[in-house]
């Protein structure tokens, strides 16, 4: 939950001692986003600017600073680090909704730390627990369980230095009154480097609707199947990889 800086190349014009600017042919992040027609049935594009996305993320990160996180070494860091670098001149965002399901894609020339993503969603960090300590929801307990998903097939495969991380998350929230909500979401992150794009980060998140607070809990509904999300993220990656053709 995001225009490419141009590199000016000077070429000496033979015989006249002058230089001419050769335009950078790299595509801008906005050119590498999914098209509305690529989205799953029922999703409708909604307005969202890079500035609005970054501001919304910043509020969530500030709130998270006062929460207890266990294991503490699993506290996510990649989102906050990248968020501080997002600007309208280096990023583009696509947002869409289907009823209460939200989808956000970000393409940016800024580098995301995928190693931190992998660490925070696997191994001993595949299950984490967050406890809210301040405000009206103090005492709320949030358990997040991550499941790794396969990297979608790409023509020619990922090149040296490129990588991708995909996860499915199941979030179980126990409120102070003991009511329990569940929510299923997906996230995909990739670093790609192609001649037509330069190095870019592609990230796609889909958040399903949270269930009503009940006890015993009501299972959350997945916004997409695992295979459906992998396929959609594959389309997002192909927007970059196919641009070289």
Predicted features and spans:
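N-terminal export and membrane-targeting signals
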Residues: 1-8
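C-terminal motif of bacterial Sec signal peptides marking the signal peptidase cleavage site
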Residues: 12-15
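Bacterial signal peptide processing site
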Residues: 17-19
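Post-signal peptide N-terminal segment of mature Sec-exported envelope proteins
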Residues: 24-44
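Sec/Tat-exported extracytoplasmic proteins
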Residues: 37, 43, 47, 122, ...
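A small/polar (G/S/T-enriched), proline-flanked helix-loop surface module common
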Residues: 50-180
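Extracellularly exposed regions in secreted/surface proteins, prominently low-complexity, repeat-rich
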Residues: 135-245
């Amino acid at each position: 939950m995001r225009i490419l800086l141009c590199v000016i190349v000077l070429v000496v014009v033979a015989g006249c001692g002058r230089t001419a600017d050769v335009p950078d042919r790299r595509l801008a992040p906005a050119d590498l986003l999914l098209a509305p027609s690529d989205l799953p049935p029922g999703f409708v594009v909604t307005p969202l600017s890079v500035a609005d996305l970054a501001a919304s993320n910043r509020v969530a990160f500030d709130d998270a600073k006062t929460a207890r996180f266990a294991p503490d070494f699993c506290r996510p860091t990649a989102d906050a680090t990248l968020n501080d670098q997002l600007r309208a001149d280096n990023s583009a965002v696509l947002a869409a909704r289907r009823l209460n399901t939200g989808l956000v894609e970000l393409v940016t020339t800024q580098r995301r730390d995928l190693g931190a993503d992998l660490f925070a969603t696997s191994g001993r960090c595949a299950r984490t627990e967050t406890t809210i300590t301040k405000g009206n929801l103090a005492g709320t307990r949030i358990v997040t369980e991550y499941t790794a998903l396969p990297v979608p097939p790409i023509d020619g495969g990922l090149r040296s230095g490129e990588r991708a991380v995909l996860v499915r998350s199941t979030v179980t929230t126990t409120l102070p009154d003991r009511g329990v909500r569940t929510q299923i979401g997906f996230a995909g992150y990739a670093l790609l480097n192609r001649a037509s794009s330069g190095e870019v980060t592609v990230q796609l998140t889909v958040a399903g609707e949270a269930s009503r607070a009940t006890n015993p809990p009501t299972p959350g509904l997945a916004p997409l199947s695992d295979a459906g999300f992998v396929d959609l993220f594959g389309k997002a990656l192909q927007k970059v990889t196919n641009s070289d053709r």
